[in-house]
């Protein structure tokens, strides 16, 4: 029993990472019908930059705030320089190549300047685990699913109750109509990518005390989070979080009852099967085209 509880707890923690990073893909897709494939590396930048600043003597909260702000700037620059120029036509896909290339460059630069090895981010919440019967989990890990759910509800409130949020929803619904109403879609896209990057960086900072911050920590997380968003139905924030949390639990169960090596293979196989059964995503809606 304790073993199952352990897998559930650590799975929810892992799922919280996927959910937070996948929420970033949701935000970007809603604004531009494109995505930033450097998103996993932005997650890494949040963790790595925070560690570097703390090592320089800054308080953790200040270092984390600077890292999140820097990630937001990176996200905005990526939208302006690597997505917008290559996403002018309805079926344009050039942004895929440019953002993938940028992600490789970011990881390479981080490896050169930071080093390839992981370094810890100190946190009092990662020193003593909380015990639940035969299972244990650090309070730091428990933050991840809590923050993911809070971010989801926060985004929903932001989209519904703020002028900027309603403008972002209008662009997501109909970009042309939003333009005619005086909304600047390019400005909305810039803000969306900055917001997505900030959330991704936050996820990296929250997990850094547990897994250590390293340049290679982001690429696979970003790929899995994108898969989570697609399987959920990328235009559904609640679905993205639910699938993210569930996928984390599934991975830990695979790791525990099959093997660590099988985790990625079986996990991606399940993603493929889910898309075969739900082509629009589990929580997605089939688009109706009127002619």
Regions found by a protein language model. Name each.
Residues 14-15, 136-214, 237-243:
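Helix-loop-helix "hairpin" substructures at the membrane interface of multi-pass membrane proteins
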Residues 1-21, 49, 61-63, 89-95, ...:
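Membrane-interfacial amphipathic/re-entrant helices at transmembrane-helix boundaries
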Residues 21, 113, 173-180, 184-187, ...:
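Cytosolic-side transmembrane-helix boundaries in multi-pass membrane proteins
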Residues 18, 58-69, 193-200, 204-205, ...:
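Transmembrane alpha-helical segments in multi-pass inner-membrane proteins
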Residues 16, 25-47, 89-94, 164-167, ...:
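Short, non-helical or kinked segments that cap or interrupt transmembrane helices
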Residues 1-2, 78-88, 280-291:
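Transmembrane alpha-helical segments of polytopic membrane transport and secretion proteins
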Residues 85-86, 91-161, 188, 253, ...:
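Transmembrane helix-bundle core of multi-pass membrane transporters
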Residues 30-77, 81:
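Membrane-embedded helix boundary and interhelical linker motif in transport proteins
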């Amino acid at each position: 029993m304790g073993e199952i509880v352990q897998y559930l707890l650590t799975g929810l923690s892992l799922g919280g990472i996927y959910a937070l990073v996948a929420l970033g893909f949701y935000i970007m897709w809603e604004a531009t019908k494109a995505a930033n494939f450097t998103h996993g590396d932005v997650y890494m930048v949040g963790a790595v930059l925070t560690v570097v600043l703390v090592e320089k003597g800054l308080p953790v909260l200040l270092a984390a705030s600077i890292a999140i702000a820097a990630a937001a700037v990176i996200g905005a620059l990526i939208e302006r320089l690597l997505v917008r120029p290559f996403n002018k036509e309805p079926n344009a896909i050039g942004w895929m190549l440019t953002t993938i290339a940028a992600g490789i460059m970011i990881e390479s630069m981080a490896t050169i300047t930071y080093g390839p090895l992981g370094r810890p981010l100190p946190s009092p919440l990662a020193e003593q685990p909380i015990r639940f019967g035969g299972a244990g989990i650090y309070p730091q890990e428990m933050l991840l699913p809590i923050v993911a759910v809070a971010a989801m509800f926060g985004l929903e409130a932001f989209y519904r109750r703020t002028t900027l949020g309603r403008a972002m929803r209008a662009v997501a619904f109909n970009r042309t109509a939003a333009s005619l109403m005086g909304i600047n879609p390019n400005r909305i896209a810039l803000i969306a990518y900055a917001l997505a990057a900030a959330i991704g960086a936050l996820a990296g900072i929250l997990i850094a005390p547990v897994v250590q911050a390293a340049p290679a920590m982001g690429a696979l997380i970003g790929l899995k989070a994108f898969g989570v968003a697609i399987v959920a139905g990328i235009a559904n924030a609640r679905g993205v979080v639910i699938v993210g949390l569930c996928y984390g639990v599934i991975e830990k169960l695979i790791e525990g009852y099959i093997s660590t090596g099988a985790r990625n293979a079986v996990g991606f196989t399940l993603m493929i099967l889910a898309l075969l059964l739900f082509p629009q995503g589990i929580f997605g809606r089939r688009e109706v085209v009127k002619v």
